[in-house]
Amino acid sequence: MLWVYKLSLKCVDELQSNEMDKYIRKILEADIYDLVQMSPLTKAPRLSSKLGAGVMLKREDQQEIFSFKVRGAYNLMRQMPRDAARRGVVAASAGNHAQGVALAGQHLGIPVTIVMGVNTPAIKRDAVSARGATVILRGENFDDASAHAVTLAKVKGLTIVPPFDHDDVIAGQGTIGMEILRQASSSLNAIFIPVGGGGLIAGVASYVKAIRPGVKIIGVEAEGSAGMTEALKAGRRVKLSAQALDQFADGTAVRQVGTRPFQIAKQAVDAMVTVSVDEICAAIKDIFEDTRVLCEPAGALSIAGLKKWLPRQPQPQRGDHVAVVSGANINFDRLRHISERTALGEKKELLLGVTIPERPGSFLSFCRALGRLSITEFNYRYADPGEAHVLLGVETDGLPATEHRLIERLGRRYPVTRLSENELAVLHVRHMVGGRSTAIEKEQLYRVEFPERPGALLKFLEGLGSDYNISLFHYRNHGSAFGRVLIGIERSSAGRQALSSRLRDIGYRFWEESANPARDLFL
């Protein structure tokens, strides 16, 4: 999705005369370079060739904590009054902000307390405590941790270091914009920026639009956590549903953008682009191929957005396009999932469900019909005396015409269902083909997103109660904060509406898949 927010000259003038002057001054006064490095701006030759446009990477993954977040945290903390610094600071975060605050505190000798949810992985807790910060585990989600941080600040007189909604944090992040204008050529056309709470895009936009107003500022969000896109559409900050918030790009999965960032963004952002999980995974690979660095999903948003934005422009885009690679703090366990989704994101793998006759020789005939195609996946299990269902993965060149010809050719002989964008097929069915069950007559099928923490499944089952019988269950760890579960439930006399209502009450994000064609073919 691409959403353009048109700037009026009046809005820009107002921003320049009011807010922009304040932020430019703060950015220029941000004395952070004894801890923060001016990250390199490097060319991405493979991406530039692929897209037919100049692509530059602003390498914030090169910071000591592998993220830009240290800029804002340090800029705020270095200006604290002596008494406040002696008492210490507190922040609620399990990610890059926590590491930024911890590093700044270690450098300045300021006591740091970080509040994290009880389900925070040990690797994240250890990374923060290794820098001398005190880690407190409280609550099951960010809201719980944040509330406890506020309580600690009041009781102990600690200073809260917010992740994005503070002038000094915004100014610290804005030094990236200052650096880009110093490093980039005069042909700079656009800057692509990942958006979570909005501090980064607010800081960069406020500086760049004042100095080089012709440079486009384009924000990029994951489709399932597009808080800034929705806010700019509505003309006000909106709060995304906790159940609907997609955590794949967890570094930018924020329910509501900040007040200050929104005020700047609605005047200084030219467009917002939203990208899918598969597009993010493909962007991670693109960055790897040019840099040999594996960045985190949030860090690849800018490239995913750039790849989506460029082909949609009515005119060829000249000049350089800068993508801010915001971070590279990725859990190793996530790489398998990212690798699997990358081919789909690049449109280099086509996933199909094909029905062939269940009789001797039909399997051979089907393979001959495929010809010399490069097969990436082939799943089959006997389940019906009359017809067989094959889950087929085929490598393609990514061109829609090639895909269309292949489906048309197979479709002349067999019923074919395209499953490449079918989340049920991609996340679950391809890993569990085993034949359809004829023993269950009334079954409802759901995809459920479970938090990866002890007791999550038990909470789900207890919330479901004893009215329902589980007829199917599939779980696969993806190395993220949330696991994906496919569950079949034999419907009792309570009925479908009552079952959906019960699931909503449990509070986990879910999707009903009872009518999904992949289910009809394989489950």
Range-by-range predicted roles:
Residues 2-456, 463-523:
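PLP-dependent amino-acid enzyme catalytic core
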